[in-house]
Amino acid sequence: MDVNQLILLLKSKIKKNILIQNITIKDKTYLHKKHISHTEGKFHLELSIKSEELKKYNKIQATKRIYNILDEEIKQYIHSVQILIN
C-alpha cells in the first residue's frame, strides 16, 4: 500500500468511529529514511485531529481510542505515529 492510499484509509476509519471537525495526516517518513531502523513500506505519520468528542477524554484515553481504531494499519504499515488532538 502506498502512503496516499494509507492516508485515505486512516481518515475514513477515524471519521467512521469518531465525530471530528477536521483531520490532517502528514507523511514524515522522509525524515527517517537514513535511520538504521527504517523499513521500506512502513511509514512515519503525524495525525492532527480536531475533535470535540476526543477533547472529552484525557490524552491517554484519546490516544488509545485512535490506536484501537487503527490497530491493523499500525501493525502492518506504520512504524511510528504522532497524534495531535486539538
Segment roles from a protein language model:
Residues 1-86:
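N-terminal, polar/charged subdomain of small-to-medium soluble alpha/beta proteins
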